[in-house]
Amino acid sequence: MKKIILYFAIVATMMACGSKGEEKTIMEAEGLEFDSIVADTLVRLTSEKGAPEAKVHLSLMFATKGDNAKAVNDTLLHSGLVVPDYLSDIDAKGNIKAALDTFLIRFANDYKKNYAPLYQRDREHKASYNIVLNCKAKINSYKDGIINYQVETYNYAGGKDGLRWTLSHNIEAKTARILTLDDVLVPGYEKQLKEKVVEALCDKFDADDLKELGEKGVMYDIEPYPSNNFILKDGAIEFIYVDSEIAAHDKGEIRIEVKGIDDLWK
């Protein structure tokens, strides 16, 4: 299993050797050690040869050492990491591998329960009943005391294309809670932050204003908003808009970094 050790307060030698803008992965004091835990399954819809099948691959990160490891893991399990969100209903009792195995069993049972009757009546479209679910987590820290936890998901459930999206959580190491914008920004931040979001989108898509953004298919007929899917950084917030959230599918996932908000931080 791949191990990543997170600490909070960067080592001076790392700062000297690291390149500008390098992501911090090893820091010192108040340590939490994470391991990747992998779970896979392949489920055939029926016992017939060549029957449709569901393939699931989960590669998630969980804390294995550290004073707050259990609390961090409990937070992660109840944070909607994977869709369907079966993990939130599982009482892991500290056994993360057992929780993932339980997820796979429930996924397999629901796949057969929901798809088998449909397949029995629709043998001509066998490929439509194939499912793929891949979830891969990564952790980092871009801001002292905060673990950024991202899950990249690919889900195919019939049709032409699968869906890809990224989920980002910012976990305060000392409390194990997931931080929201309200937790880190001063009251009344909304108007100024919205303006900064529009400004960043205009820079990204070479637009002069919100109207031109809309003409380019971004935030068209949508009231601009900061995504609740974001990465906290030193002096900046990177917002993630999933595929088709604020623009057409061909633009894919959209990420913008909002800076110049020093007066908004708590």
Predicted regions and their residues:
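Positively charged n-region of N-terminal signal peptides that target proteins for export
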Residues: 1-4, 18-20
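Sec-dependent N-terminal signal peptides
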Residues: 6-10
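C-terminal motif of bacterial Sec signal peptides marking the signal peptidase cleavage site
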Residues: 13-16
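Compositionally biased intrinsically disordered regions enriched in Thr/Gly
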Residues: 18-266
